[in-house]
Design a protein with these regions (language model features):
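Surface-exposed interfaces of beta-sheet-rich extracellular modules
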Residues: 1-20
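Feature responds to low-complexity, polar/acidic, surface-exposed segments characteristic
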Residues: 9-11, 34-54, 62-63, 67-115, ...
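C-terminal beta-strand-rich structural cap/linker in extracellular carbohydrate-active enzymes
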Residues: 21-36
Length: 198
């Protein structure tokens, strides 16, 4: 704001509302606007609001369930390991104290150590049966569904629903331990088949 001689007027105020003492002359007011970055924006360069998974990524990031693979990457297409999955569930539970079973291939210094111990102690995972958990192994669909099935049961969620999975051409290849979990997951809409009928 300037008076008719071009002298700047003193502005007072805050929060977008400003005042000045009106001089005995015409006043020229020029307003300039600056765009600010969306404070709600995620820090990841590989996740945009147009992505179908944006809201889910925002939720897990805002709630400290997942943090991404680096400061600016979430890596949404990265395959998930067994250690990652139990860590997600562990954080979802508020990272409770964990003690009990320790697998021979889970080093206490690893980020997933407490999560694996907690998951095993609560019957969410049981490992491979040879004393190993395989934390860095990529998790398969049937393993993931089995983990979620046991996690839901542990939370007191009704897991009695079943749907026939025999319509899928590869249903015969589902491991025996995972059949009930797959039937439950299909019944509740957690999974569906692929376009090729598998």
């Amino acid at each position: 704001a300037t008076d008719s001689r071009g002298n700047e007027l003193t502005l007072t105020g805050q929060d977008g509302r400003f005042e000045f003492i009106m001089p005995a002359s015409d006043v020229t007011v020029n307003a300039y606007f600056t765009a600010f970055e969306d404070a709600e924006r995620l820090p990841f360069t590989d996740v945009s609001k147009a992505d179908w998974f944006y809201d889910a990524v925002k939720y897990v990031y805002d709630n400290n369930i997942m943090s991404g693979t680096s400061g600016d990457l979430f890596s949404p297409d990265l395959q998930t390991t067994r250690g990652m999955i139990v860590t997600i569930l562990y954080r979802l539970e508020g990272q409770p104290k964990a003690s009990g079973i320790l697998f021979s291939d889970v080093e206490q210094s690893m980020y997933y150590a407490d999560a694996v111990t907690w998951a095993a102690a609560n019957g969410v995972v049981s490992g491979y049966g040879n004393g190993e958990f395989g934390p860095d192994d990529m998790i398969t669909r049937e393993q993931l569904v089995s983990v979620l099935y046991r996690y839901a049961a542990n939370k007191g969620i009704d897991v009695s629903g079943r749907a026939d999975i025999k319509q899928f051409s590869d249903a015969y290849s589902v491991s025996g331990y995972a059949v009930e979990a797959m039937e439950w997951a299909y019944a509740c809409g957690l999974i569906s088949g692929m376009q090729d009928g598998t």
